[in-house]
């Protein structure tokens, strides 16, 4: 019988029968900026489908990730990874904090994608952290930071092209990485998920927002937008 190991805002981790494997289940929960939790019926099923599809695509271009296989509508089998305590945020368009903190016009397109690191902590409200701090805290080595940056940009470039192909703009995405040990050596591995829960996705022509950005003001449209994204990706 599988044992619950951890429950986050939108996913639950369970033990698996084999060592170094886990079961990741996608729930319908979503957390608003106010901290209130809401349920979007069917969201977890769509996120499982979308993330499984995208992780498979990334594996095909040589990006090591924790996804092994989809078990059922809500669950997938994943590799255990020692997850880094940071998130990597890549943005190609002014949105979110760039509008609030820098006064940029929403939708302004950057010459090159901008990369930020944030502490992976809801308790501390995901503060920005720089490379010098990451090194001094002992969270990653310099080589690991370099590898994470290279992989993150490669992932963002690939996903941007994939989404453009289905009429969607990848405005921003949040990526998480970790290390997997093979004897004394370790490899960097992409973890978590890639879905409308952690990507800002806009219609490429109208800039109409899709995914999690609808939660605050148009929650009734959330499922429909996730479904649209899943259906568009089926075309690839």
From Swiss-Prot:
Give its E.C. classification number: 6.3.2.6
InterPro entries found in the cross-reference section: SAICAR_synt/ADE2_N, SAICAR_synt_PurC, SAICAR_synthetase
**UniProt GO molecular function:** ATP binding; phosphoribosylaminoimidazolesuccinocarboxamide synthase activity
Its domain of life?
Answer: Bacteria
Keywords from UniProt, A to Z, are: ATP-binding, Ligase, Nucleotide-binding, Purine biosynthesis
| Pathway membership | Purine metabolism; IMP biosynthesis via de novo pathway; 5-amino-1-(5-phospho-D-ribosyl)imidazole-4-carboxamide from 5-amino-1-(5-phospho-D-ribosyl)imidazole-4-carboxylate: step 1/2
Top EC group: ligase
List the catalytic activities from the record: 5-amino-1-(5-phospho-D-ribosyl)imidazole-4-carboxylate + L-aspartate + ATP = (2S)-2-[5-amino-1-(5-phospho-beta-D-ribosyl)imidazole-4-carboxamido]succinate + ADP + phosphate + 2 H(+)
GO cellular component terms, semicolon-separated: cytosol
For this entry, list what GO says about its biological process. Answer: 'de novo' IMP biosynthetic process; cobalamin biosynthetic process
Q: Name the family the entry cites.
A: Belongs to the SAICAR synthetase family.
Q: Quote the PANTHER family the UniProt record gives.
A: MULTIFUNCTIONAL PROTEIN ADE2, SI:DKEY-6E2.2
* Name of the protein this chain belongs to: Phosphoribosylaminoimidazole-succinocarboxamide synthase
In the UniProt record, what gene is named as encoding this protein? purC
């Amino acid at each position: 019988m599988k044992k619950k190991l951890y429950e986050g805002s939108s996913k639950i981790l369970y033990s698996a029968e084999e060592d170094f494997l886990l079961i990741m289940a996608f729930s319908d929960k979503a957390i608003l900026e106010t901290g209130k939790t809401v349920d979007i019926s069917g969201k977890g099923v769509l996120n499982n489908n979308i993330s499984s599809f995208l992780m498979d695509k990334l594996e095909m271009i040589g990006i090591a990730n924790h996804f092994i296989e989809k078990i059922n509508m809500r669950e997938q089998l994943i590799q255990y990874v020692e997850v880094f305590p940071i998130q990597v945020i890549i943005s190609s368009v002014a949105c979110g904090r760039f509008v609030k903190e820098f006064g940029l016009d929403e939708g302004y397109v950057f010459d090159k994608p901008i990369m930020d690191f944030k502490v992976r902590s809801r308790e501390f409200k995901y503060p920005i952290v720089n490379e010098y701090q990451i090194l001094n805290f002992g969270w990653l080595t310099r080589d690991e930071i370099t590898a994470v940056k290279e992989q993150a940009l490669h992932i963002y470039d690939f996903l941007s092209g994939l989404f453009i192909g289905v009429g969607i703009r990848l405005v921003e995405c949040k990526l998480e990485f970790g290390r997997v040990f093979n004897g004394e050596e370790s490899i960097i591995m992409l973890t978590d998920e890639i879905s409308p829960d952690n990507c800002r996705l806009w219609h490429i022509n109208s800039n109409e927002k899709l995914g999690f950005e609808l939660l605050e003001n148009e929650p009734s449209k959330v499922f429909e937008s996730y479904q649209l994204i899943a259906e568009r990706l089926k075309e690839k």
